[in-house]
Amino acid sequence: MDSFGRAPPLWPQSALPRVPGAAPSSSGLPWSRVGEIAIFTFVAVLALYLLWSWVGRDLLLVLKARRGGTTEELTFGPRERHSLPAVAVARVENPPCPSGSVEARPFTG
Protein backbone atom coordinates (compact mmCIF):
# COMPACT_ATOMS: atom_id res chain seq x y z
CA MET A 1 0.00 0.00 0.00
CA ASP A 2 2.29 2.44 -1.29
CA SER A 3 -0.41 4.96 -2.27
CA PHE A 4 -1.89 5.37 1.16
CA GLY A 5 -3.68 8.76 1.27
CA ARG A 6 -3.75 9.19 -2.51
CA ALA A 7 -6.96 8.30 -4.27
CA PRO A 8 -6.77 7.11 -7.84
CA PRO A 9 -7.94 9.74 -10.40
CA LEU A 10 -11.54 9.36 -11.52
CA TRP A 11 -10.77 10.56 -15.05
CA PRO A 12 -7.61 10.29 -16.99
CA GLN A 13 -5.41 13.40 -16.99
CA SER A 14 -5.95 14.07 -20.73
CA ALA A 15 -9.75 14.35 -20.32
CA LEU A 16 -9.61 17.27 -17.85
CA PRO A 17 -9.95 20.78 -19.33
CA ARG A 18 -6.71 22.67 -19.54
CA VAL A 19 -6.74 26.20 -18.15
CA PRO A 20 -3.87 28.46 -19.19
CA GLY A 21 -1.91 30.09 -16.41
CA ALA A 22 -1.61 33.51 -18.10
CA ALA A 23 -2.69 35.21 -21.31
CA PRO A 24 -0.25 34.96 -24.18
CA SER A 25 1.82 38.07 -24.75
CA SER A 26 1.32 39.93 -28.01
CA SER A 27 4.27 41.16 -30.00
CA GLY A 28 2.76 44.51 -31.11
CA LEU A 29 0.57 47.21 -29.63
CA PRO A 30 -2.63 45.94 -28.06
CA TRP A 31 -5.82 47.03 -29.79
CA SER A 32 -6.93 49.03 -26.78
CA ARG A 33 -3.80 51.19 -27.09
CA VAL A 34 -4.40 51.68 -30.82
CA GLY A 35 -7.96 52.77 -30.05
CA GLU A 36 -6.74 55.24 -27.42
CA ILE A 37 -4.30 56.76 -29.91
CA ALA A 38 -7.01 57.04 -32.59
CA ILE A 39 -9.48 58.69 -30.20
CA PHE A 40 -6.83 61.09 -28.88
CA THR A 41 -5.85 62.08 -32.44
CA PHE A 42 -9.48 62.70 -33.41
CA VAL A 43 -10.12 64.83 -30.32
CA ALA A 44 -6.91 66.81 -30.88
CA VAL A 45 -7.79 67.58 -34.51
CA LEU A 46 -11.32 68.57 -33.52
CA ALA A 47 -10.00 70.84 -30.75
CA LEU A 48 -7.56 72.56 -33.12
CA TYR A 49 -10.33 73.11 -35.68
CA LEU A 50 -12.69 74.60 -33.10
CA LEU A 51 -9.90 76.75 -31.68
CA TRP A 52 -9.20 78.17 -35.14
CA SER A 53 -12.85 78.68 -36.05
CA TRP A 54 -13.86 80.31 -32.75
CA VAL A 55 -10.75 82.11 -31.53
CA GLY A 56 -8.10 82.27 -34.23
CA ARG A 57 -10.18 83.92 -36.92
CA ASP A 58 -11.54 86.55 -34.53
CA LEU A 59 -8.07 87.27 -33.20
CA LEU A 60 -6.82 87.73 -36.75
CA LEU A 61 -9.65 90.17 -37.47
CA VAL A 62 -8.88 92.18 -34.32
CA LEU A 63 -5.18 92.38 -35.12
CA LYS A 64 -5.93 93.41 -38.70
CA ALA A 65 -8.31 96.14 -37.51
CA ARG A 66 -5.75 97.48 -35.03
CA ARG A 67 -3.20 97.86 -37.81
CA GLY A 68 -5.66 99.99 -39.71
CA GLY A 69 -6.59 97.44 -42.33
CA THR A 70 -10.09 96.62 -43.33
CA THR A 71 -11.89 93.72 -41.72
CA GLU A 72 -14.41 93.43 -44.53
CA GLU A 73 -12.14 91.49 -46.83
CA LEU A 74 -8.97 89.82 -45.67
CA THR A 75 -6.31 88.98 -48.21
CA PHE A 76 -3.74 86.28 -47.55
CA GLY A 77 -0.48 85.88 -49.38
CA PRO A 78 1.58 88.24 -51.54
CA ARG A 79 -1.19 90.00 -53.42
CA GLU A 80 -0.99 93.56 -54.60
CA ARG A 81 -3.55 95.86 -53.03
CA HIS A 82 -4.97 98.57 -55.21
CA SER A 83 -5.97 101.64 -53.28
CA LEU A 84 -9.16 103.37 -54.26
CA PRO A 85 -8.90 107.05 -55.21
CA ALA A 86 -10.18 109.44 -52.60
CA VAL A 87 -13.59 110.77 -53.47
CA ALA A 88 -14.22 114.40 -52.64
CA VAL A 89 -17.38 114.75 -50.65
CA ALA A 90 -19.28 117.85 -51.68
CA ARG A 91 -21.25 119.49 -48.94
CA VAL A 92 -24.86 119.88 -49.89
CA GLU A 93 -26.55 122.94 -48.46
CA ASN A 94 -30.06 122.42 -47.17
CA PRO A 95 -32.66 124.51 -48.96
CA PRO A 96 -34.03 127.29 -46.81
CA CYS A 97 -37.30 126.69 -45.03
CA PRO A 98 -40.33 128.63 -46.19
CA SER A 99 -40.69 131.75 -44.13
CA GLY A 100 -44.02 131.90 -42.35
CA SER A 101 -46.19 131.43 -45.42
CA VAL A 102 -47.22 127.93 -44.36
CA GLU A 103 -48.94 127.55 -41.05
CA ALA A 104 -48.01 124.31 -39.30
CA ARG A 105 -50.98 122.52 -37.78
CA PRO A 106 -50.17 119.11 -36.42
CA PHE A 107 -52.75 116.30 -36.33
CA THR A 108 -55.26 118.02 -38.56
CA GLY A 109 -56.39 116.43 -41.51
Curated annotation (Swiss-Prot):
Gene Ontology biological-process entries: transport of virus in host, cell to cell
Source domain of life: Viruses
Keyword terms: Host membrane, Membrane, Transmembrane, Transmembrane helix, Transport, Viral movement protein
Principal cellular location given in the protein's record: host cell
TM region(s), chain numbering: 34-54
Cellular compartments annotated: Host membrane
Purpose of the protein: Involved in the viral transport within, and between cells.
Protein name: Movement protein
Species of origin: Sugarcane streak virus (isolate South Africa) (SSV)
Record lineage: Viruses, Monodnaviria, Shotokuvirae, Cressdnaviricota, Repensiviricetes
